[in-house]
């Protein structure tokens, strides 16, 4: 995989971002892309590429839900769901941050669900960037540390455990 990625040159990071974004829209597990980004591009570039792909995919999912499904879903929902949507809209970006930091709803599903609300797009994007950044850093570090460990770097396990600790602190 690494040789193939290197053979792509400048297209490798672009391809990673596009695949991550497309995978997000199609409900592929983001953790796989996050780990791959760290393993293939290192912790810093991997984080930036992962965050770019994740936010592009999240935004695309949000927009698909908003412009292709929101009216239809709203027309079919009952009073209870309409109250939930209204409550989410009232909290706006704060709800987005909370939902991202306390992942009770899977990432890909959350993107579509939030698109059914009237939360402003800019608020959604900025809140998502802010709240997704810590986990994105952790996944890139874990991917990088895993690759280093496979390459025989004994110190990589220490870095991997540190990244897992950060991820656990974010999750709980």
Model features per residue range: what roles?
Residues 117-131:
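Membrane-helix boundary/juxtamembrane motif in polytopic membrane proteins
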């Amino acid at each position: 995989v690494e040789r193939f990625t290197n053979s792509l040159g400048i297209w490798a990071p672009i391809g990673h971002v596009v695949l991550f974004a497309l995978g997000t829209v199609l409900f592929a597990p983001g953790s796989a892309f996050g780990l791959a980004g760290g393993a293939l591009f290192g912790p810093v570039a991997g984080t930036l590429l992962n965050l770019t792909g994740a936010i592009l995919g999240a935004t695309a999912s949000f927009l698909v839900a908003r412009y292709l499904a929101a009216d239809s879903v709203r027309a079919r929902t009952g009073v209870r769901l309409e109250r939930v949507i209204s409550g989410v809209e009232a909290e706006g970006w704060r709800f987005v941050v909370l939902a991202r930091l306390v992942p009770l709803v899977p990432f890909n599903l959350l993107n579509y669900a939030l698109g059914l609300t009237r939360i402003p797009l800019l608020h959604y994007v900025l809140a998502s960037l802010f709240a997704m950044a810590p986990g994105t850093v952790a996944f890139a570090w874990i991917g990088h540390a895993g690759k280093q460990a496979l390459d025989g770097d004994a110190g990589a396990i220490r870095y991997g455990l540190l990244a897992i600790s950060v991820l656990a602190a974010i999750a709980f």
